[in-house]
Structures are given as structure tokens and as C-alpha cells.
Amino acid sequence: IALTFPLSNNFKAINYKNILYAILVMFLFAFILLNNFVNQFFEAISNGVAKLSSATAEGTSFLFGSLFESHPYVFALNVLPLIIVMSCLSALLWHWRILPLIIKGLSYVCEKLFNLGGPVSFGAAANVFVGQVEAPLFVRPYLQNMSKKELLILMTAGMATISGSVMIALAGQLENQFADLNVVRHFLTASMLSVPAAIMYAEIMYPSNDVTNTINTETDEKIYKGSMDAITKGTRDGLNIAVNVAAILIAVLALVSIVDGVLGLISANLSLQSILGYVFAPICWLMGIPWNEAIGAGELLGIKLATNEFVAYIQFGSLDPDVFSEKTKVIMLYALCGFANFSSVGILISGIGAMAEN
């Protein structure tokens, strides 16, 4: 938090009450979501994820036949179809007004505690379940009138969280590291904690009392004309996301390999991963990771920032389970949870720029 203060555009206008509220809300969310009395809720979510993965496998098996049956854990056949199915399901839940109901509850807390307008609260809360570009779409009519602080809240919340479809897709990649841990539970907790955190950092960097008009939820929720429209549009959006993820992974991994090849000419032991490990090791140590594990953890954090969370989590999942202690593995599960990377900045600028050209 202290590192953010020099970046503020108006240090004297910072509302310290909002910062205190944000920290208290994060502690409250963490206490509720990590307490034993919600175990049954997360157990139900875990079972739902297993059923969803199984159902997706049925569809993938029908389409690819023996290719999928011979290679069920190939990324393109395992993770990408899950993104498509989850996107379709999210659209359907939105049309049935189940997701808006949950999001409204979160946005109500943001409105009352942080004196935020309905649109930005709604958009920030939506990031817990949908992607960084989809969330601003829900409040598109209000974007052109939002203050810099409100836009920063939307963008920061988008980069600090991961969508429900990506959340479930990544959970399967980490089974090697967390055999007895409900990964989806921690992904959901990390995303929910990131919403008040995003508001806090925006309050520090762009303090402002400007509030947009109250959102008209009755009209703005009607994105789809019917259930079939939600299914088809949700599937199409999921396909676009899956194709983008696949394309970015191919390009990014190829570029990393090229950079490593060039660095290898200088020294056989030199690589982009090793450089990033030393750069981010102090940050990992500050997060509570022992110094003897900080360089390895820093490599993952650096890879996530330079490439994306998919590359980082895939690399994390491929490590030997004994490389990190249990504490370090859980810390890294939270630290890597978010769309924050250089490509996301471009995605957000182009996405929000297209929705509100001014």
C-alpha cells in the first residue's frame, strides 16, 4: 500500500476512511470464505466443477473421438473446451438473472462502504465472475461519463481477478500441486478479495468524489433476447476467448523460447525465467515466502507478468510437488490469480476505448 502513495495524483485528497474500509472488508471476506462453516458451500461448488468438467469431456469426446480419448490431458482438448462451456453457462445464468443477483449483492456493499456509483460498483463486482472486457460491457452506457478513478477501479478489478471460466479451466492444471485442496475455493476467495483491493488502490492513485448516475438494472440486465440467444452468444464469446488464449499461448511461448535462445548465447545458465526470478524474489519474500524458495516463486511471478496467468499456472502445475512448501504453494496460488500482465493492459485499453471513444 505504501508503495502506491508516490503514484497518487493528489496525495492530499486521499480518503483514508475508504482505505481502512477496504482493508476491513478484505479481512471480513477472508474470514467468511476461509472459515469451516462455508465448507459445504465450497464442497458443492467443487462437485459442480467436477460435473461440469465431466460434461465438457463428453462433448469434446464426441467431437474429437479417439484423439481426445488418447490424449485427455492435452491443453487444447481439456482446458479450451471448458472455457467455451463455462462462457455459455455464464450467459445462461445471466439471462436467468442468477448472476446479476449475486453481483448486485457485492455492488451494494461497494456503494454503501466506499461511496461509489452503481455502475462502477456493478462493473467491479462483475469481474469476480466474468472477464476483464465483459465486465465493462455490462455498464457500457455509463463508461463515457465515468471519472478517471472509476475507470481505474474497473480496470484494476479486471486485472486483479480471473473469470469463472478461466478459474475452472485452471483448477485442473493444478491437481499435481494441490491434491487435497479445493483450488476453486481459493480462486474465488482471491477474486473476491481483489475487488475491495482494487477500489483501495484506485482511491490512492486517483482520489475523487465524482459519482456516476445510478445504474438502471431493469434495462441493463437484458443483454439476451431468450435462453437460446444466451446459449449461442455465450458459446460464441467463449470460442473467441478460447481461440485468443490458444493464439496468445503459442505466440508468447515461442517468444520466450526465442529470448531464451538469445540469452543462451551469452551464458548457458541464463534465461528469461532466471532473470525474472531474481527481480521478483524480494517481492515474494515480502509476501511471506522463505528466501530459499523466493527465487523459484519469483520466476513464476515474473513469467505471469511478462506473459499471462495461463503460462504461469501451467508451469506451476508442471513442477515437482516437493519444490515448494505447502505454505508457499498456497501463497503462489493467490499471487498468480489475476489477469494482470502487459497484454491485459492492451486488451483493456482497446476494449474500453472501443466502448467509450472519448
What do the predicted segments below correspond to?
Residues I103-F138, V211-A230, L272-Y278, L300-L305:
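Juxtamembrane inter-helical linkers in multi-pass membrane proteins
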Residues A55-L116:
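Hydrophobic alpha-helical hairpins/lids featuring a short glycine-rich hinge
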Residues L113-L174, A297-N358:
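Alpha-helical membrane segments and immediately flanking helix-loop junctions
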Residues A44-S54, L101-N115, N127, P141-Q144, ...:
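Short amphipathic alpha-helical coupling elements at transmembrane boundaries
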